[in-house]
Every structure is written in C-alpha cells, then in structure tokens.
C-alpha cells in the first residue's frame, strides 16, 4: 500500500477508536497529536496507539506491554502472537478503564 493509503487507513482507525470510546461513555480522554492517539483514563492509566508509517504498522503501548500490528488482508495482526488489533486494544481499554468495552458494530 502507498504511504497515503496507510495514512488514510490509520486516520480511520483513530476515528473508530475515538468514536467507540465516546459511544461507550467511558471515563477517558483522548488526545490525537500527529501519529499518536493517547487514551487517558480517570485512574491515570494510559493506552497509546501509534501509527508507524515507515513500517506501515500500528502500535499499541499499554500496561500489558507493547504490540506491533501489520495489515494482513482486512485485519491488523500482531507480529508477536498473531492477536488482532481491535481485540488487543479493547482488552487494554477494559484493563485501563475497569469498564466493559468492545469494538462491536
């Protein structure tokens, strides 16, 4: 994929994350700065989502660790364990917020 296609896909991912957090009414603030989306919970915990254009990867940093995801077909899959991006992020958000959360729909 071209760099502009990757940037558009990653913008769409950031939009989906922010929308899902808003729709769930989580006690969390999101801040998007350049290639980084920071999710901060009332507890002070944070989850960081970063797009890495050079490698065309999406990265997640959370208390549970750091994860790198590459596009495979229509999904973003972790290089370390084959986990799916949205499932991994949902678990990190549940852990940080202490609330039920998913990306269904």
From Swiss-Prot:
The keyword Iron applies. Disulfide bonds: none annotated. One of its GO terms (biological process) is iron-sulfur cluster assembly. Keywords: Iron, Metal-binding. SUPFAM superfamilies: Frataxin/Nqo15-like (SSF55387). InterPro entries: CyaY, Frataxin/CyaY, Frataxin/CyaY_sf, Frataxin_CS. The keyword Magnesium does not apply. PROSITE patterns: FRATAXIN_1, FRATAXIN_2. One of its GO terms (cellular component) is cytoplasm. GO terms for molecular function: ferric iron binding. HAMAP family: CyaY. Involved in iron-sulfur (Fe-S) cluster assembly. May act as a regulator of Fe-S biogenesis. Belongs to the frataxin family. This is Iron-sulfur cluster assembly protein CyaY. It comes from Chromobacterium violaceum (strain ATCC 12472 / DSM 30191 / JCM 1249 / CCUG 213 / NBRC 12614 / NCIMB 9131 / NCTC 9757 / MK).
């Amino acid at each position: 994929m071209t760099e502009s296609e990757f940037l558009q896909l990653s913008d769409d991912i950031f939009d989906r994350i922010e929308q899902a957090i808003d729709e769930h009414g989580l006690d969390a603030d999101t801040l998007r700065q350049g290639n980084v989306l920071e999710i901060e919970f009332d507890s002070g915990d944070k989850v960081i989502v970063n797009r890495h254009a050079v490698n065309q990867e999406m990265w997640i940093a959370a208390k549970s660790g750091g994860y790198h995801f590459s596009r495979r077909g229509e999904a973003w899959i972790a290089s370390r364990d084959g986990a799916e991006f949205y499932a991994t992020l949902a678990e990190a958000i549940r852990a940080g917020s202490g609330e039920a959360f998913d990306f269904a729909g």
